[in-house]
Amino acid sequence: MKLTDITEQKSEDKMKYKITFEDEQLTCLAEAGTTVLEAQIAAGMTPDAFCGGNGKCGKCKVVINGKEVLACKTAVDRDMTVYTGNKKEDRAQILAQGSGRQAEFSPGNLPEGTDTPLLSAVDIGSTSVVAYLLDGTNGELLGTKSILNPQRQFGADVVSRCSYALNNGGEALSGCIRNAVNILLRELAKGAGRNPEDIVRIVMVGNSCMHHLFLGIPTDTLALAPYTPKVTEAQELMAARYDIHVHPRAQLWWLPNIGGFVGADTVGCLVASDLDTCEEMTLLVDIGTNGELVLGNRDGLIACSTAAGPAFEGAKITCGMRGSKGAIDHVTVKDGETICHVIGETEAVGICGSGLLDGAACLLKLGKIDETGRLEKEYHFTDRVFLNQKDIRELQLAKAAIAAGIRSLCEKKGIKVSDISRVLIAGAFGNYLDPASACAIGMIPPELQTRITSIGNAAGEGACMAAVNREQFERSRILAQKAEFVELALDMGFQEIYVEEMEFPGESEHE
């Protein structure tokens, strides 16, 4: 579906109607018969369509003529005014900062043709995309930009996107993510008073699915167990080959994948940390739709991924939403009642991942949920926002995946959980969650609560380090080879641990 400027023009083949997205301050033309969701996507919006537009998740609700409908199931058959509930200024919280670690400026050979070159790093996450602009003469960070990953329209998790690509071809997924990268780089260059044509190197990270979809590599082996990537090696390519509108001879590098869905983003985290050189047993956790875990020290690293699912991103939770204005992001208990903090200090319209963890931890503390996850009755934080039994079960599935992954890696390593000296939490969700809540619900073993440190967007930080220092890029190859990958999907022992971790800790475990 192609959008045009608003005119009275009518298509010779199909009638076109004017669609006004009132709260987005956006108007477009859409062909008759397309869905409102397709019109949103074509207009450059990033609606929540976690089920891929199949009418199952209920997250794409909009209001038309005073009636709430699903955008994915509503056909364009007339001029429409649509209310999405997302004002243009309301944007999701997307973390760009890391721990502040930097690499010595030593970029190696750069393409010639500009006296003031720019470098870039891009972290393609399942939920969001973050880009960094760096001075190509000294490595100074000039700016960061982020947007929601437009691939969310094809599914909330990596397996559903790989399956979509398998059944429908991957061109749409590849095209929309490349376009997103172009938008970010163009805005970054403009913000620095420069041209995108000055960007001579881009270093990219993302999980194996994001890697394959960006590069146009078939995802059939990632759609089904044992989830094997077709390419794991680091890539040194030309940006022009992938329609990235920068310097005509710009380099496009991808850090290597490790195995399964443990991809270049995890390697970026390793580049930005010291797991391969430290003596202390360290656990690196990137909690998201697909949780990636690395355990080890200078004597060796072991890695796995766990299908935590999209509950932490707001999918499959009745009142769930991403971390944007109106989301309950933190919950505490005072005088036997729950107290909620809402992003934007406004009326609560939903609950995001960090609020979900806090909310469950508080309900456990109040005795509203027992160890099995049984909820006394639907619990309302506000008139509009609540958790029900189904929501608690979805949380149990997600938290059990992370907890079972940690236990499984410890068993493979031959250590006890208590032997872990440090826990490094990477990623946006890890930055906003309360470690006490994560431990109270048993997502992270309670005995590790005081050993938890958030390291922010370490994946993006590692990509920046590789962009400004050629040796760090080469180091990423060594790190990927050093990390032993464990496929938990085929491990019967993992399945048993997973079932055990479905329960919440007893009171004695998290006092």
PLM region descriptions:
Residues 133-171, 305-312:
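Short glycine-rich, Thr/Ser-proximal phosphate-binding strand/loop in the N-terminal lobe
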Residues 15-26:
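Eukaryote-biased recognition of intrinsically disordered, low-complexity regulatory segments
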Residues 24-34:
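Short, contiguous acidic and Ser/Thr-rich linear segments
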Residues 160-169, 176, 180-187, 211-215, ...:
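Helical "lid/coupling" subdomains associated with nucleotide-phosphate turnover
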Residues 46-78:
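Local cysteine-cluster metal-coordination motifs and their immediate loop/turn environment
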Residues 33, 53-56, 75, 122-128, ...:
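A short acidic Gly-Thr/Ser loop motif
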Residues 3-6, 66-121, 200:
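Fe-S ferredoxin-like electron-transfer domains
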